[in-house]
Design a protein with these regions (language model features):
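Conserved helicase/translocase motor-coupling segment
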Residues: 1-73
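SF2 helicase motor core recognition
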Residues: 11, 103-106, 115-141, 145-169
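Short beta-strand segments
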Residues: 12, 53-60, 89-95, 117-121, ...
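Short helix-terminating capping/connector loops at secondary-structure junctions
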Residues: 47-52, 85-88, 164-171
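Conserved helicase motor "Helicase C" RecA-like lobe of SF1/SF2 P-loop NTPases
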Residues: 60-94
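Conserved nucleotide-binding/hydrolysis micro-motifs of P-loop NTPases
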Residues: 61-63, 98, 123-125, 143-146, ...
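Conserved helicase ATPase core of P-loop NTP-dependent helicases/translocases
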Residues: 84-121
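A conserved SF2-helicase RecA2
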Residues: 147-203
């Protein structure tokens, strides 16, 4: 059982970015970080006039102060260096060490001065009312429970989203990144089976 957990952990990390397993691996134009940065930049520029905002979720590779490398910071680097997005407009919820700091970031998202907010399910999936300008939600990984995925999407897909209502047909795009023949496929199927079972119980 312990070996299975270790193998699963490695498989999750490998699907996200090989550098999480071994820092010796080099960046790759076809990894999740590269694809995600490109998609974020597309939405950023598409909704520049409206100051549209985006949420980016991942429970792996989260920002840790003082850490040499993490997926959040890598995508932020790409956004700044490759796509010209100002670094101060990209924030990590883990940077907020107080409720006051957290509220300031949420207010900045609603104001459009922060345009991209990264976070994990536990830290960003609930209690964040920053939906006012949300145009896209990105999932770098998928949680194990359907309810967690719903909570993530609920940061933008909810009442009070003015930009989606006025400029995007009252829709928020949800982008899920996956690697073929990886643990991602297994997790998607598992989520689908769980959601189907839950729906059958409710009906």
């Amino acid at each position: 059982k312990a070996k299975m957990l270790i193998a699963t952990d490695y498989a999750r990390k490998m699907a996200l970015d090989m550098r999480m397993v071994d820092p010796a691996y080099e960046d790759h134009p076809d990894n999740k970080a590269s694809h995600c940065a490109r998609m974020i930049a597309e939405y950023y520029h598409k909704y520049e006039t409206q100051k549209g905002t985006q949420f980016v979720f991942s429970d792996l590779g989260t920002y840790q102060p003082g850490e040499n490398w993490n997926v959040y910071s890598e995508i932020k680097r790409k956004l700044s260096e490759d796509y010209g997005i100002p670094a101060h407009e990209v924030r990590f919820i883990q940077e907020c060490k107080s409720e006051k700091a957290r509220k300031a970031v949420i207010d900045a998202m609603n104001a459009g001065t922060v345009r991209v907010l990264f976070g994990s399910t536990s830290m960003l999936g609930t209690g964040v009312n920053a939906q006012k300008r949300c145009v896209a939600i990105h999932h770098l990984d998928t949680p194990w429970r359907p309810s967690d995925l719903e909570q993530r999407d609920g940061r933008g897909v909810r009442a009070g989203n003015e930009i989606a209502k006025l400029y995007a047909g009252n829709k928020v795009d949800v982008v899920i990144y996956a690697v073929e023949k990886s643990l991602d496929s297994y997790k998607f199927n598992l989520l689908h089976c769980k959601q189907t079972f839950i729906s059958q119980l409710k009906s």
